[in-house]
Amino acid sequence: MSRFDFIQTSLPDLMLVQRKAAEDYRGFLSRFYCIEAFAEAGIKKPIVQINQTLTRKKGAVRGLHFQHPPHAEIKLVSCLKGEVLDVAVDIRRTSPTFLQWHGEILSAANRKSLLIPEGYAHGFQALTEDCELIYLHTSAYHPDAEGALNVTDPALSIDWPLPVIDLSKRDQNHPFVTNINFKGVTL
C-alpha cells in the first residue's frame, strides 16, 4: 500500500501529495518522501537539499522564487506547524498555462504537500502565527541561478487570503513581469 496519493492540480505537472499516516494509540507515522513511491509517480530526480523555514507573522508572504536552468529544481513543500497558502506559478515559456497560479492550503493537520515541478515559481502566505515549512529540493541553491517575481504583481493576480504583510526588502524589490518583459524559462 502506498503511503501517498498523487493528485494532479489545475496546472500541468503540479501535484498535490496527500500523505497517509499510520495511526495508533501512541500517535502516528507519516512519510514525507520515499524514493520508490515518487519514482512510480514519475519523479526520478534525487533529493539533494532539505530546508526548513519559520515564518513568525500571520499574513507574511515569502516568494515568488525559482532557479533558472541548469539549476531548475523540483520542490516538495510540506507544513510542519501552522497553516499556509502555498502557491506555484507556471513560468515555463511555452506552457499553455504560462503565468497562471495554483494555491493549496498546507498544514500539519491535513498532511498535504505540494510537489512543484521545474519551471514554476514558488511562494506562500502564513495563515497562522509561527508557520514552519520543510522543503525537499532536487537541486542545491545556486545564487547565480536565482530568479524571482513579485508576489503583489497585478499581472499574476494571486488571491492572497490575507493582507500581504512582513514582506522582506528582497521580496519587495522583485520585479513585476510587465516591467521586465518576462518571457519565462525554457527547460
Features from the language model and the residues they span:
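Non-catalytic, conserved peripheral segments adjacent to functional cores
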Residues: 1-109, 130, 137-187
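Conserved metal-binding segment of the jelly-roll/cupin
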Residues: 106-129
